Amino acid sequence: MYILVWKEGQQIRTFQDLEECGQFQTASNITDGQIFSINVTPTMSKGGETGETQLRRLMYLSASTEPEKCNAEYLADMAHVATLRNKQIGVSGFLLYSSPFFFQVIEGTDEDLDFLFAKISADPRHERCIVLANGPCTGRMYGEWHMKDSHIDNITKHPAIKTILFQIARSFSSMWSYLPKNAANMLLLGKNPNKQAPEPMSVVVTFIYLVEFSSILAHPGLTEQCADILAAFVDACVRNVEGTGGQVAKFITGICMAYWPINRAEDALVGLQQLSEDLAELRSQQPPGSALSLIYSRCGVHYGRALLCNAGFRKADFTLLGDCINTASRITSLSVKLKVPLLLSFEVRCLLGDEMREELESSGLHKVKGRDKPVQVYQFNAPELDSAMVRAKIEQFNPGRYRALCPVKPYESLHPAQRPPIFDDTPRENQPKLSQVQRRDSLVDRLSLIAKLAFPSSMMAGGEGQLITLTYISQAAHPMSRLDLASIQRIAFARNESSNITGSLLYVSGLFVQTLEGPKGAVVSLYLKIRQDKRHKDVVAVFMAPIDERVYGSPLDMTSATEEMLATFPPLQDVLSQLAKSFISLETYVPSTVVRYLTAGNNPRNLQPVSVEVVMLATDICSFTPLSEKCSLTEVWTICNTFIDACTSAICNEGGEVIKLIGDCVTAYFPPTGADNAVHACQEIVSFCAQLRDAFHDVLDCRSVVACGVGLDFGQVIMAQCGSLGMTEFVVAGEVSARVMEVEALTREAGRAIVITEPVADRLSPKLRDTGIVPCQEGVDGVPCYGILGPEWELDVATIKKNIYGFHDARALAAMKKVDDGTNAPGRGAPAGGIPSSPKVRPPGRTNSVSSYTPDPNEALDPRMAESVFLDMCHQRGDTANNSIAVKLRQAANDDRLDLGRMLQGPHELMPVMQAIKHLTNLRMLNMSDNFVDDNNVGELVESCIPMRSLQVLDLSNNPGLTKVIALKRLIKHNTQVREILLNGTRIAPTEQRKLQSSMNVNRLCASTDLKGSHKYEH
C-alpha cells in the first residue's frame, strides 16, 4: 500500500500501487507531496497459516428465485452439498441468507474460483449475481469452513441489521441496470469504478442519432408516445451494438454513443446497418397512429485513441474521452448535410478488409466544426436519408385514437404522492462560502458541501409532525474506540429524547448504520446535522418512508457488531462493510431521481413518465478541440474532471439536477421557479474557471487556459425511463434540450459567458432582471436572448484561442529547451546554425522537411535493434505494443523487405514505428500504405528512410492525408537508389506525381556515374 501526503500533512490518500499514486499526483498537480510505502499484514482466521499462495476472495450478491422455501433446513441442505464439492477442489467460504438475498464469499485459487462461480451463476435457484468484491488475498479468512451457512434470523433479531441488509441489497440490485456498462463490468470484476486509473485504448466510436427527434418532441400530438419511441430506440441500439461485440457508452436525448474494439470495425458497420434495417422493419409493422413509424437512425463512425476513465466525483460517469469522440460526433452531424444514413472516416476505412472496402464510395473532403483540417469520409451505396422528408412526415402525422403503451402524463396533473421525485427539495441550511484560496487549493474537498440526499416530494406533502423513518449509512472518519462510542451514545440519547426521536445506531468496523424514527421536521433537521458531522464521511440514505407506529422504544439503541453477533457469525462484518461500500460507489452513477425513488421504498421500474416545464442548463469548455488536440489523454481527463466537479458542485448546491456528463459538456435542469438559482449556478461555474486560470497562471498547466460558456433555456421536457432490464436509461428529453445547446453556443458570438433566453429572463427576480441582463444581437430559433451583465461575465473567444495556441507553443519551446540543455551539456558540441539538437521537438511553424535534419555521426544503427526500439518507445508512451508489428520488425532485420501495409492501429503508433525502421538500413522495399501517413508526419518518415541506402521502393498508397511532395523530393535527392514511390489513393496532384517520377528516372540514368560518398550517411 502507498500513502500520498501533501499540504504539510493536511491531506492524505492511500493507493494500492505506485503507478496509481503517481497518476493521481500528476493529474492533481500536487508538487509538494511525499509518497510512503507501507506493508499491511491482515488478520486471518484459521487456515491462513497454511502457506498457500495466489489465493483470491470473491463476494457476491444474488436474489433467490424461491424465497418461500429458504428456511434453515433448505440452507443446511444447500450448504451440505456445497461442502462436499468445495472440499474436493479446495474452496472455503460462507453463505448468508437474508430474505430474499443470498450473500456468499468463496476463497481459493483463480482456476477453482472461475470454475465454481461459473456453476454458481448458472444455478436456477437464484438470479442476477452481482460481484461485490473480487481480488487477491494473502490467506484464507474462512479456512475452517468449506461452506458455512446461516440464516439471518439465527444470527440476530436486531432490526437495524435486517433493515440494512434488505434495503441496500434491494437498492443495489435495482440500480444495476442503470449503470454504465463499463462501470457494471468493473463491478463484476470486483473493482471499484471510482478507483480505476484512466486506461488509453484504440476504439471505433459511433454516434447514433434518432433522426429529427426534436421535431417529434415539438409535435403536440406525439407527446404521449415519446416514451414509447425512446424505449424502442434504446432497445434497438443495445441489441445491435452489444450483439456485434460493442458497448453502449451512454444515451443523450435521442443520441446513442457506442464503441467497439479495434478488431471489430467490420462488425461495427454490420451492426449499424442492421440497426437501420431493424428500424425499417419496425416502421413497416406499425398500425395507423403509432409514432414508432417515425423512427429513423443515422450514424457517424470514427476511429482513434480514447481514454476509458471515470469522470467526476459527486456525479460520475465511466466513459470515453478524447479528440476522436468529438470527431465522431462531427461526422454524424455531417451525415445530415450529405443525406446518408451511415458515414465513416478514412481511419475506419483503413481497418476494413478488401471486400468491405470495395462496397464503399468516397464522399469527399469536408470541413467540420472544431477541426482546422478537412475530414475524408466514405459511405455505403444506400438509399438517401433526407431529414427534410422525415420532418415533413412528422408534421403531417396524426395519431388519431392510438394509445401509447407507456403514456406520458403532465406532472402537475398527478397527485403529490404519485409524482416522481424529479426535483431536489432538500432543505438547505446556510452553508459557508469558500474563499478563493480554499477553492483553488482543493477541488475535491469542496464537494463535501453537495447535498447527498434529496427527499421525495411525496414526503414533503405531509406536515412537520408526520411520523417517518430514515436509515442511513456512513463511514467513520477515524477508528472509533469504546470510549468514543460511549460518548456518542450518551450525547445522542439526551438529544433524541428531547426531540421525540427513537432509533438505533449500529457500528460495524468503521461503518455506521443508523435508523431514526420521529416527527419529520425533527428527523430531517437531525439528519442534516449528521451530514455535516466531521466524524462521518460518505453519508448516504438507503431508506426513508412514512410509518404508522415506531419500531424502537428507546431514544437510542446502541449496538456494536463486534460482540455476540460476530461471535455467532464473524463474516457478517465483511458482508455489511462491503455491501455499504459498493452501494456508495453505485450511487454516484445512477440518476438522482432513481436514487430518491429507491430511498422512498419504491421500485424504480414503476416510475411514471411525465411532462414538465424546467429551466435547462448546458455548459462546456470553450475551444476544447484545439485545447485537447495537443494534450495527452491524461491531461484531457484532468481538464474534464476538474470542470465536471465544479459544475456538479454549483448545480447541486443551487437545487439543480445533473442530467448527463458528455465529455466536457454538462447538462442539468432546475425547477420552473428556480431561474435565479440557475443563474447563480452559472455564475459560480464561470467564476471557478476564472479562478482556475489565475491559480495556474504561472505554470505550464493545461488548466491555465480553461474557459467556458453557459446557456439557460426554459421549456417542456419529458422524463421517462426506457430500455430493457439489461440496460435502463432515465431520459430527460424535449425541444428545449436541443435548443439550450444552441443558446450555449451563442455565448461565443455574443461575447457573454452566460446567455439566457427570454422565457428564463421573464422568470428572474425583478432585481436581477432589471439590472443584471443585457439584450443579445441574435436569438435562437426566433427566441430573443440576453447576456448576464458585468465585466466578469464577458467572454472573448479570440483571446481564449490565442491563449490556447500560446500555451501549446510555450510548452513545445520548453520541451525543446529541455532537450537542448541535455544535448549541449559540457563535453558535447553545440548544434550548428542554431538548428535544434533534437528532431523530435520542433519549434512552432517549422515545416515538414528533411532539409534541416543533420545526421548524428555517433548514432548507432543496427537492424537487430529495430524491434527493441519499437517496444521501448511504446512502453515510454504508455501504449500496448502491437505484437504483429514487432514480429515484422524482427523478421525485417534479416530481410530486405518490410510490409507494414494497413498494420498500424492508429496514428499513435507512427512515431514508434518510424524510430524503429530507421535502424533497418538493409531495406530495399518499404510498404507504409493505409497507415495514417499525412503531411504532418511524412517528414519524420523520410528522415527514417534516409539511412536506407539501398531503398528502391516506398509504398505510400491510400494515405489521403498526403497532399505535398516536398519531403519526398528530399528523399529522392539524398537516396538516389529510389526507383518508385507509390502514391495511389493520396491527394497529391497527378502533375506533382509525374515530376517526382521524372526525378527518380533521372537518378536511374545517372546511377552508373554515382560518386563514392554521395550519400549523406556514407563517411
Swiss-Prot record:
Biased composition (Low complexity) is annotated at 825-839
Question: What chemistry does it catalyse, as a reaction equation?
Answer: ATP = 3',5'-cyclic AMP + diphosphate
Q: Where is this region: Disordered?
A: 822-861
A Gene Ontology biological process in which this protein takes part is:
cAMP biosynthetic process
Q: Carries keyword Transport?
A: no
A GO molecular function annotation here is: ATP binding
Q: Name one Pfam family in it.
A: Guanylate_cyc
Residue span(s) of domain BLUF: 55-148, 467-559
**EC number(s) stated in the UniProt entry for this protein:** 4.6.1.1
Q: What domain of life? A: Eukaryota
* Record-linked SUPFAM superfamilies: Acylphosphatase/BLUF domain-like, Nucleotide cyclase, RNI-like
Q: What is its main location?
A: other
Alphabetical keyword list: ATP-binding, cAMP biosynthesis, Cell projection, Chromophore, Cilium, FAD, Flagellum, Flavoprotein, Lyase, Nucleotide-binding, Photoreceptor protein, Receptor, Repeat, Sensory transduction
* Job of this protein: Acts as a blue light photoreceptor for the step-up photophobic response. Mediates photoavoidance.
Spell out the note in the miscellaneous section: The 1224-5/9F strain is deficient in phototaxis. It is not known if this is due to defective adenylate cyclase activity or defective BLUF domains in the beta subunit of this protein.
Protein name (record): Photoactivated adenylate cyclase subunit alpha
Q: Which organism is it from?
A: Euglena gracilis
Gene behind this protein:
pacA
